[in-house]
UniProtKB/Swiss-Prot annotation:
Protein encoded by which gene: TRR1
A UniProt-annotated Pfam family: Pyr_redox_2
Organism annotation: Pneumocystis carinii
Reactions accelerated catalytically: [thioredoxin]-dithiol + NADP(+) = [thioredoxin]-disulfide + NADPH + H(+)
Protein name (Swiss-Prot/TrEMBL): Thioredoxin reductase
Additional remarks: The active site is a redox-active disulfide bond.
PROSITE patterns (UniProt xref): PYRIDINE_REDOX_2
Length: 325
């Protein structure tokens, strides 16, 4: 099977690209994945409860509901959505070749590929994590920190770098107190961020401390069991939120070694757009965004990728017509 455009990934960036390409009558194919990276089709937002910062929803919207709306809109404008995971992708020449997990014997081709597979937060994998994920445990303070379950409550952040510092400072807007759990006896954060943390009246840093277990009432988390790695003392910290700030992993395994990536595995794009060092291969959303990682910025990135793909195909079609005339 040959397609003009294939989109790999089904988060806001993938579906926004599909909407634009569908409206351009390019009949895009979107592979939404089958539990790719352990996440259901729709990406990270399917694990989020209330989304309060996506424009157009003054009362907020459930993450799965938002992604279902994205999916319906993609289909409405002509995108073909396939629930399968692309397992191999050859970018050595165009048209690009790929195959899926359901049948790795059969290869398909595409003139243009948009990779929108996102990134996933690193987890601690402690007892209670699965029970209280999005019920007290989160990997995004900016996304979830203002939620009612966290407002006016003591909260904890895990990490020691700039991301942990930023998340802790952000949470002070809503929390009565923020505990920062740092595994070592010093911060990895930049000096200016460390200074802000150390002098903030709402923030207490617990040095040499790791989280062992999250506890609660089987509905919401209300406590974290912690351990001092130097003294071996184990205690319970009464907090209603535990935020992970220990980094993200971009889902770029499919193309590593083929396309230019940075040291952390994020795809390098040109001039803030979706173009990569390979003509016809575009990256959108969190696979190339290690800074913002928001649903709305991801959607905007997908828009750029869709428009760039449409423009490239139109230019190539025009050149072909000139050569044939």
């Amino acid at each position: 099977m040959h397609s003009k455009v294939v989109i790999i990934g089904s988060g806001p960036s993938g579906h926004t690209a599909a909407i634009y390409l569908g409206r351009a009558e390019l009949k895009p194919i979107l592979y939404e994945g089958m539990l790719a990276n352990g996440i259901a089709p729709g990406g990270q937002l399917t694990t989020t409860t209330d989304v309060e910062n996506y424009p157009g929803f003054p009362d907020g919207i459930l993450g799965p509901s938002l992604m279902e709306a994205f999916r319906k809109q993609s289909e409405k404008y002509g995108a073909q959505i396939i629930t399968d995971t692309v397992s191999k992708l050859d970018l050595s020449k165009r048209p690009f070749k790929y195959c899926c997990e359901s049948n790795e014997e059969v290869f398909h081709t595409a003139d243009v590929v948009i990779l929108a597979t996102g990134a996933y937060a690193r987890r601690l994998n402690i007892p209670g994590e699965e029970i209280y994920w999005q019920r007290g445990i989160s990997a995004c303070a900016v996304c979830d920190g203002a939620a009612p379950i966290f407002r006016g409550k003591p909260l904890a952040v895990v990490g020691g770098g700039d991301s942990a510092a930023e998340e802790s400072l952000f949470l002070t807007r809503y929390a009565t107190k923020v505990y920062l759990l740092v595994r070592r006896d010093k911060l990895r954060a930049s000096p200016i961020m460390a200074k802000r943390l150390l002098h903030h009246p709402k923030i207490e840093i617990l040095w040499n401390t790791v989280a062992l277990e999250s506890l609660g009432d089987n509905n919401l988390m209300n406590c974290v069991k912690i351990k001092n790695v130097k003294t071996q003392e184990v205690s319970e910290l009464q907090v209603n939120g535990l935020f992970y700030a220990i980094g993200h992993e971009p889902a770029t395994t499919l193309v590593r070694g083929q396309v230019e990536c940075d040291k952390d595995g994020y795809i390098i794009t040109k001039n803030g757009g979706p173009e990569t060092n390979i003509k016809g291969f575009f990256a959108a959303g969190d696979v190339q965004d290690k800074k913002w990682r928001q649903a709305v910025t991801s959607a905007g990135s997908g828009c750029m990728a869709g428009l760039a793909a449409e423009r490239l195909l139109a230019e190539e079609e025009e050149m072909k017509n000139i050569e044939d005339s």
